[in-house]
A protein has these predicted regions:
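Juxtamembrane intracellular "pre-TM" segments in multi-pass secondary transporters
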Residues: 2-8, 193-223
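Cytoplasmic helix-loop-helix junction between adjacent transmembrane helices
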Residues: 110-148
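Intracellular juxtamembrane helix-capping segments at the cytosolic ends
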Residues: 120-133, 327-341
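Extracytoplasmic gate region of multi-pass secondary transporters
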Residues: 32-34, 217-272, 360-364, 368
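Cytoplasmic membrane-interface "Motif A"-like loop-to-helix N-cap segments
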Residues: 78-89, 279-294
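Helix-loop-helix hairpin linking two adjacent transmembrane segments in secondary transporters
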Residues: 144-191
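Extracytoplasmic
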Residues: 13-45, 236-242, 363-367
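Conserved MFS/SLC helix-loop-helix module at the cytosolic interface between two early adjacent transmembrane helices
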Residues: 67-104
Length: 401
């Protein structure tokens, strides 16, 4: 299986391309977090409720991303990164092009298409790492993806706000279209992986594995932990966080984006620490994901107090803890595929993502329409539930030999 991805140099180059692809998907994922003024302008121009357009535009990405998980993992495992990865990069280009027309309808449809296509990036990366590297490296390799993803998330905070002020949204979309075409071409021209269909495998076998995963309690407990950590963080980061910061805390859009930058920076720094701790120190996964959900619970508790007391100092502490919780959740994708055949790795992570991002989309939609104080209470309840479920159902997947 590993030979299909080429030697050390070629497999490393493939990971670089896939990381660039993932950077683009992550940027799309969180960019709406600082676009409130642009979205409000379009809503007012078209007589649409401001909060409703923000909620729908943001969650459109995640509902489509979730839908795509149903079959992109199976397609990647069956037909490989070369064909499926490059195809979905082209679909991403089409979505960005649709957004370029700047009407509410084209923005929502385009963002949904982008979200649909983005599902291929992380799943392709997880397939490539499973086929090319040992299980003991999966935590660190996943942390690399989250690090570069969060670097793009950092760019999508205060720097993006400055860029939008200077050049506008259309210029940004033009640059993103060019970058997407380059990634699509590189994936098709340089990748050798053709999936199990070219190696005597059958699509029905992959679907059978998917059904087995659905019945596994481990997958549901693990997904609950990720919803409690990364899901709640992402909902805050990409939608309702700016409402909290500009509302109860009365911060400007520019200052609010700086607070979101702190969250992304902490997430970035915590991810490789979690990967190293899991792979090399503990040589275990479950203690790390358990620590993540406990930290998330503490973070939302602090944020609830900070909002009631209008304390920016306590708010800052809660955001740092939230970043740590999200960073430590990076052991979850390896846990979703370890213990199963590596050739089905994309399918395994796809189901995990489907549960995670469907819940995230629902949390986003509800939280954006509520008063921020009650939104925090919802996140806290989710974090507590995630702690209980991961403790009961998730199993250790990386054990000492």
């Amino acid at each position: 299986m590993r030979a299909k991805l080429g030697g050390v140099g070629s497999r490393g180059f493939l990971l670089v391309i896939l990381l660039v692809f993932y950077v683009m998907t992550y940027f799309h994922r969180v960019m709406t977090g600082v676009m409130k003024s642009e979205i409000d302008h379009i809503a007012l121009k078209n007589n649409i409720d401001l909060d409703l357009l923000l909620a729908v535009l943001t969650s459109a990405y995640f509902y489509a991303y979730t839908l795509a998980q149903l079959f992109i993992g199976v397609l990647l495992d069956s037909f490989g990164i070369k064909r499926i990865g490059s195809l979905f990069a082209i679909i991403m280009f089409a979505g960005i092009f649709m957004m370029y027309f700047m009407s509410p309808q084209s923005l929502i449809l385009g963002r949904a298409i982008v979200g649909f296509s983005c599902a291929a990036a992380f799943l392709a990366y997880q397939r490539a790492t499973s086929l090319s590297y040992s299980r003991e490296m999966q935590g660190r390799l996943t942390s690399y993806a989250l690090v570069v993803g969060n670097l793009s998330a950092m760019v999508a905070t205060y720097p993006l706000r400055l860029a939008l002020n200077a050049a506008g949204l259309k210029t940004l979309l033009e640059l993103m279209m060019i970058a997407t075409l380059v990634v699509a071409a590189l994936l098709y021209l340089t990748t050798k992986d053709s999936g199990t269909s070219m190696q005597g495998g059958k699509l029905v076998e992959t679907l059978s594995h998917f059904r087995h995963l659905v019945r596994d309690p481990h997958m549901w407990g693990l997904s609950a932990a990720s919803i409690a950590t990364y899901g709640t963080t992402l909902a805050y980061q990409s939608t309702w966080g700016q409402k909290l910061l500009t509302g109860p805390f009365r911060l400007s859009l520019e200052v609010s984006s700086q607070y979101l930058l702190v969250l992304a920076l902490t997430f970035t720094l915590a991810s490789p620490v979690a990967g190293f701790l899991s792979d090399r120190v503990l040589v275990r996964r479950k203690p790390v994901i358990t620590l993540a959900v406990l930290t998330s619970t503490a973070s939302w508790s602090l944020m609830l107090y900070a909002t009631k007391a209008t304390s920016t100092e306590v708010l800052s502490a809660s955001l740092v803890l939230l970043g740590i919780a999200s960073g430590f959740h990076i052991v979850a994708p390896p846990m979703a595929k370890e213990g199963y055949d590596a050739k089905y790795s994309a399918t395994s992570v796809a189901l995990f993502n489907m549960i995670l991002f469907s819940a995230t989309a629902i949390i986003q939609t509800i939280s954006t329409l509520l008063d921020p104080y009650y939104s925090i209470i919802i996140q806290l309840i989710v974090a507590i539930a995630g702690t209980a479920l991961v403790t009961i159902f998730a199993r250790e997947t990386l054990k000492r030999n």
